[in-house]
Swiss-Prot record:
Span list, region Type DYW motif: 484-581
SUPFAM superfamilies: TPR-like
Ranges for region Type E(+) motif: 453-483
Molecular functions (GO terms): RNA binding; zinc ion binding
UniProt name for this protein: Pentatricopeptide repeat-containing protein At1g34160
Amino acid sequence: MARVYMETMIQKCVSFSQIKQLQSHFLTAGHFQSSFLRSRLLERCAISPFGDLSFAVQIFRYIPKPLTNDWNAIIRGFAGSSHPSLAFSWYRSMLQQSSSSSAICRVDALTCSFTLKACARALCSSAMDQLHCQINRRGLSADSLLCTTLLDAYSKNGDLISAYKLFDEMPVRDVASWNALIAGLVSGNRASEAMELYKRMETEGIRRSEVTVVAALGACSHLGDVKEGENIFHGYSNDNVIVSNAAIDMYSKCGFVDKAYQVFEQFTGKKSVVTWNTMITGFAVHGEAHRALEIFDKLEDNGIKPDDVSYLAALTACRHAGLVEYGLSVFNNMACKGVERNMKHYGCVVDLLSRAGRLREAHDIICSMSMIPDPVLWQSLLGASEIYSDVEMAEIASREIKEMGVNNDGDFVLLSNVYAAQGRWKDVGRVRDDMESKQVKKIPGLSYIEAKGTIHEFYNSDKSHEQWREIYEKIDEIRFKIREDGYVAQTGLVLHDIGEEEKENALCYHSEKLAVAYGLMMMDGADEESPVRVINNLRICGDCHVVFKHISKIYKREIIVRDRVRFHRFKDGSCSCRDFW
């Protein structure tokens, strides 16, 4: 009876002071000798929201010979803490303690599970193989729940080869195993493989869960495959908040922001802050700042407290629309509302000021930050320095980027263009030499387009497509027509020391141009209202931006491009970004 009473008392602890009082009572009443009650108290202290992990460690130090449950409580606490890597340190200490013949603690499935979750959170890939070996050595590989946790940890650490191997070796695969690998493939930018696995799961008769649907919709978002996304979302009720959030995100990222808003409006359950944030972000990246900010302003009226993501979405809307004063007001309001600013908030404001030509203010904000600025902030300043031909600021930003050890090909191009605009050709040559000496590699451009139910991929100068000859002929046709319309190639974007004609040729076979050309081919005779939709893995280049404006006017076809920053809607010779990107 005493044990039941004390366990009830532990469960009733709702503050740290109550936990401390109970611990004192344990010591004086002798309950500390009960391993069951002791481990329950440790768990309450280590993992409850009102507990204190450091105090749990102090309690642990009082134990002369900690048992398995005592160790597990501490490891579990660190796994869910802000320092998950410490869980692996405790695991190694436990492993050392359990190796002696007189040990009374043993690493069990729960120990491994908690440590794996810590490794997944800390992205501690070096520990994964060690844990995998221990699982096999201790005969725990038949534990399907533990194997799924291991699979999830491999996936989150980006080791998809090991994840696939483990998945194929598992004697029993439940829906959680499939979900872990599908989600891992999506986060590892292997969305096509994720969709193949999702379809294989359906073929094998595995009933999908809510988590499956969210992961699959994420894959569709990456691929821009709205048709498959609609098929997956079809049949779900309008009150499932997690799936509806994923559907809003999917529609937005596939370029159908009005359909996203339809899901948002028709949702019958209680909208979470994530629901609102997803919709605000959707409008923001589509350049519909006023609709985004209108929803942002409704948050508190609907009983939702804006969080850091809400403010980031609002700042993103201001950033894409050039709403400088409103953006600064949103940024300054964060402190009044008790919302802590992070690097992304500063990044939005720096980009907003920079693109408005207020480079000194942007520079001052970077220098006054309480945290160390990341390279993205300086890259925003460098990009704006090119727009406004500010050599001094470009050199400052470039120097800061280099000191951080970042060698991005785009940064070299921007600095070179600033020098070229001032006729400083020796400096242009120096930048090129610096780029070559550092062996800077360009990230290959990759674009997707969906045509007749199939996703097609294109790389720069790609000739792997079965219709590449027809696509290149279409490119030649486009080049002829846009030249007649006044197009001049932006050859300054090409850093290589080659002739102007070769530079123009290098520009005309960018992946997004190949995708648009293919889209135009596939839409011959199609409804004029149907746009060409392309997804690009990089920020759209200035030349492609100009070309697509000409194409939209000449071919009377809307072109929608999602790059890594935002959506661009080209129609009748202009872009929704108003050349502010």
